[in-house]
Amino acid sequence: MTPASALVDQRSRPLRVLRLSLTARCNLACPYCCPDLEDPPDLLSLEQQLRLIRVACRLGIHSLRLTGGEPLLSARLLPLLQAIAAARATPGDPLQGLQQVALTTNGTLLSDQRACDLRQAGLDRITVSLDGVDGAVVARMAGRPTATAGDSLARKVLGGLASARSAGFDPLAGELKLNAVIQRGVNEDQLLPLADLARDQGVELRLIEYMDVGNRNQWRLDQVLSAAEMVTRIRARWPLQAVGRPTGGTAQRWRYVDGGGHLGVIASISEPFCGDCNRLRVTADGQAFRCLFASVGTDLKPALHCEAELLRLVADLWRRRDDRYSDERQQTTGSMPHAEMAYLGG
């Protein structure tokens, strides 16, 4: 087998990150994500998930992110984390090379007990999503009917942040972050309130450009507020110093000059990072996608019964990878369908 360090795609990009979705379901209805009401049939079993993670580690991944939908809706989350932790502690197991296990959640189900359970089960990092501070805006971004419902939702998310911090997820160590999708004309007025909130909470805020993932959200380019515009607006209130984007990373990071922490911006529309993208996405039912903006995936289930066969399939899939959709967006937008965000797991 080719050494993991030599496994690269057609553009010399290594495989380093696995994003594994546990469910396509969500308890919110964010219009940019459009989650499913039910999971697809034939969800991967715990054994299949572990086999996939083990193979991915053998092929070079060092980071695993568990996503959804809302992953806290999955009854398999804790058993999976516990099994991963046991493997990471076993001499000679490929999962010993796993440097971090992270989770993306909307935070509404992140109680004190849940956060403690996740930490004790071996979770290293949590990213919580909140797209505004004002109740009416939060309601609009989360598919809730009223501003009162939006206020209630925001309180739950902030409670989830507090629970994660109490459970030992340290923002200063990058173990707890806040994500926000920004859509021009919808929640762009929440930039400063969100930044103020994150500074007050001591967590890094990561602002995400509104992306053309899926077909249900009726995305248009004029709805995108660019990362540069976001930074300009925040910098006018709090001076910023550029930190940069690490190779293979998604966020361009900035440091508040006054010591108020860090800010990240993910500019997949205005400043694509296809050139060093190192992520493989696998859905809850075992479809592998080499690009967030892909239209079709590769079904891994026929190979999931045998680790050697799965290793060959994933390695071949990655070697043949030539995706750079964001770089080619102007030529391809509108001409091909995309898999939905909640199905892909972001």
Curated annotation (Swiss-Prot):
Record key words, sorted: 4Fe-4S, GTP-binding, Iron, Iron-sulfur, Lyase, Metal-binding, Molybdenum cofactor biosynthesis, Nucleotide-binding, S-adenosyl-L-methionine
Domain Radical SAM core: 10-240
Pathway, per record: Cofactor biosynthesis; molybdopterin biosynthesis
Gene3D superfamilies, per the entry: Aldolase class I
Residues annotated for [4Fe-4S] cluster 1 binding in this entry: 26, 30, 33
Pfam families according to UniProt: Mob_synth_C, Radical_SAM
Catalytic reaction(s) noted: GTP + AH2 + S-adenosyl-L-methionine = (8S)-3',8-cyclo-7,8-dihydroguanosine 5'-triphosphate + 5'-deoxyadenosine + L-methionine + A + H(+)
Binding site for [4Fe-4S] cluster 2: 274, 277, 291
Binding site for GTP: 19, 65, 104, 177, 279-281
Signal peptide extent: none
Oligomer and partners: Monomer and homodimer.
Role summary: Catalyzes the cyclization of GTP to (8S)-3',8-cyclo-7,8-dihydroguanosine 5'-triphosphate.
The protein's name: GTP 3',8-cyclase
Protein source organism: Parasynechococcus marenigrum (strain WH8102)
